[in-house]
Amino acid sequence: MAVPDFKKSKFPALSPDITDKDILFEDNHLIAVNKRAGDIVQVDDTGDESLDEKVKRYIAKKYNKPNGAFLGVVHRLDRPVSGVILFAKTSKALDRINKMFKSRDMHKTYWAVVRNRPAQEQGTLIHWLVKNPQKNVTKAYEKEVSGSLRAELHYKLIGELGGYYLIEVDPVTGRPHQIRVQLSTMNCPIVGDNKYGYPRGSLKKSICLHARRLQFIHPVKQEPVNIFAPLPKDGFWDRFENF
């Protein structure tokens, strides 16, 4: 398996508009998109167009809404992370989904590719995290410290190819950079994530962390919803599609 050559990667053009193939789930209340690595979910100080604006434009065009469409941001993914992200199309759905996230009634599953094999094939990681907003870096502590938030996740090794290891992660909490920093604490930094210990960064604005699945009970219809995000088609992730 070829090592991904991050140093020679070309910096990407601005991410294109949302199309039907990017939509993972949609009804009158919710819409889920397969986020591309490099997209920002909401506007920030970079000035780059955000994913929520692209989704608003997609809805307005699809349903002929010249005055624009309502869209509520339910949760976020870090810019270099890909995968399923959910938005609310109505204020009622937004309110109910927000309550579900706070009560941890949303089950999220991520896939991460790391270079080092975990010492234990499965386990639970618990840390106390402190984020430095100026540097946009989160630090993990073994014990509670001033200003820290408890972070918990479960992980399982599910495959290996060419010296790279595929880990499935189920976060219990949703802290900033949680998966990235917690995997790094067990000497398993995510491929491409030099912010948390991988030796080479990615000029593609991407790391090998993908929000693979989101499961919950629909806030209005009260039906089970299981949203599954295909892996990025970038030549590296393709090799893990059959796991």
For each predicted feature, which ranges?
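RNA pseudouridine synthases
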Residues: M1-F243
